[in-house]
């Protein structure tokens, strides 16, 4: 039979993963252990050499530091106590379930579902007619104001066809003509096309001189100018050639005269 902890409301063994410690041989320390056990057990008269107490009843300062490190690293499963360690922690008993109340609850019928159903039935709204809310929504949509916008509309009465479920005709108001009042800047929308054009589309014609000429007249003027210049150049060249011929003839006559004088 495995050894069990002798403390009240505790029965831990080594199979529970707890370390068990035998009562010390020192008489003074053993008396303190007995007093601890007797505090919760009236039938305890004294422990013997086989009596043990588990590690749950000792404070952390009662354990050897090296044994704690070894257990945390899983090198060892058993803790060691320092000299003169005394148990001080009692285990609180778990509350036992009350059998009388459970029997009463089992014997009583389950009335929670009925109470919840009654509450839901009270809170649930009844059926609402479909004609009035629709007319109210349409009227609210036709008359609205945004910011400082004030719109007065002349409504035209339009009769709709009677619905199969509702024989009465529903009359709704549809806005046809509106007169706009002062409107806030953030709500103004201009639907008109702008009168100006983009910069990339605008075509500007710059007039040089007092009048504009087409391409044909400009080419004729250019041709007349070039022809006149050509005539001037040709006449100048002819004058130059005539002058050169005359100068050469005068030079030849001068040379002939000199030759005649030398021969004479």
Swiss-Prot record:
Disulfide bonds: none annotated. The keyword Isomerase does not apply. Coiled coil: none annotated. A zinc finger (THAP-type) spans 1-90. Residues 99-122 have a biased composition (Basic and acidic residues). Keywords: DNA-binding, Metal-binding, Zinc, Zinc-finger. InterPro entries: THAP1/10, THAP_Znf, THAP_Znf_sf. The keyword Metal-binding applies. Residues 90-136, 160-195 are annotated as: Disordered. One of its GO terms (molecular function) is sequence-specific DNA binding. Residues 160-175 have a biased composition (Polar residues). Pfam families: THAP. This is THAP domain-containing protein 10. The lineage of its organism: Eukaryota, Metazoa, Chordata, Craniata, Vertebrata.
């Amino acid at each position: 039979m495995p050894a069990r902890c002798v403390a009240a409301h505790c029965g831990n063994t080594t199979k529970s993963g707890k370390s068990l410690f035998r009562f010390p041989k020192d008489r003074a320390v053993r008396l303190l252990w007995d007093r601890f056990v007797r505090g919760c057990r009236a039938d305890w008269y004294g422990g013997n050499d086989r009596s043990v107490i588990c590690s749950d009843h000792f404070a952390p300062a009662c354990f050897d530091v090296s044994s704690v490190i070894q257990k945390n690293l899983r090198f060892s499963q058993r803790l060691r106590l320092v000299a003169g360690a005394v148990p001080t922690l009692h285990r609180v008993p778990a509350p036992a379930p009350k059998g009388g109340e459970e029997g009463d609850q089992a014997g009583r019928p389950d009335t929670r579902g009925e109470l919840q159903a009654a509450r839901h039935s009270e809170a649930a709204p009844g059926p609402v007619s479909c004609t009035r809310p629709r007319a109210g929504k349409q009227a609210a949509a036709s008359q609205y104001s945004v910011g400082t916008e004030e719109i007065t509309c002349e409504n035209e009465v339009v009769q709709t066809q009677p619905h199969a479920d509702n024989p009465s005709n529903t009359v709704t108001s549809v806005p046809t003509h509106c007169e706009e009042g002062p409107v806030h800047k953030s709500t103004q929308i201009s639907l008109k096309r702008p009168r100006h054009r983009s910069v990339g589309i605008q075509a500007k014609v710059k007039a040089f001189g007092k009048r504009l000429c087409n391409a044909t007249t400009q080419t004729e003027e250019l041709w007349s100018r070039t022809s006149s210049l050509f005539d001037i150049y040709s006449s100048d060249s002819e004058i130059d050639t005539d002058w050169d011929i005359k100068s050469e003839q005068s030079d030849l006559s001068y040379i002939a005269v000199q030759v005649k004088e030398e021969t004479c």
